[in-house]
Amino acid sequence: FNDLVQLTQGNPKVDGQQLMQHINQSLTLRRQYMQLLQQLAFATSPVQAAASSATSSAASSAARIISRKSAEFELLFKPDKQFSGQVYVILKIPHSIEKHHNQGVRINCCSNELISSIHFPPIVDGKTQLLMEESDQKFINMFDAEFAIYLS
């Protein structure tokens, strides 16, 4: 349980990848982690749209959004001009706290069946960024309207 709390609070020293595998394999752990996120996250972006009744491939492409905004943060992406298939994911936090300047920020993307988590570098001048592959499932989840976002 302590590891779940540490991951929820954005501790970069926790082995997030291994812990997320355990969380996604256990409904009990997933529920506990979701409860912790709802209590401890400093910012959230809820599910953006209701599920479409179209086919699954059409629904997933229709559910893609280009940015997530809330009062606490903005998450957007820009394609890399030199390398096709790569994107810069930019996280802007206008009122970040000291922890985010030292440890960075963890973004948790949550649906009913899956939770993915990615750690961003420390905030500098109100923003941070990562270079990712467009095909990376974590990138896809961040900009899928059917995933809620929790920042810690």
What do these predicted regions represent?
Residues 66-152:
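C-terminal, beta-strand-rich globular interaction domains
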Residues 20, 35, 39, 45, ...:
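Generic preference for flexible, low-structure residues
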Residues 1:
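Acidic-aromatic/histidine active-site loop/patch
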Residues 6-35:
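N-terminal amphipathic alpha-helical interaction or autoinhibitory segments
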Residues 8-11, 35, 45, 119, ...:
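Generic alpha-helix signal with a bias toward terminal, lower-confidence helices
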Residues 29, 44-48, 116:
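Short alpha-helical interface elements
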Residues 34-84:
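Transition segment at domain starts
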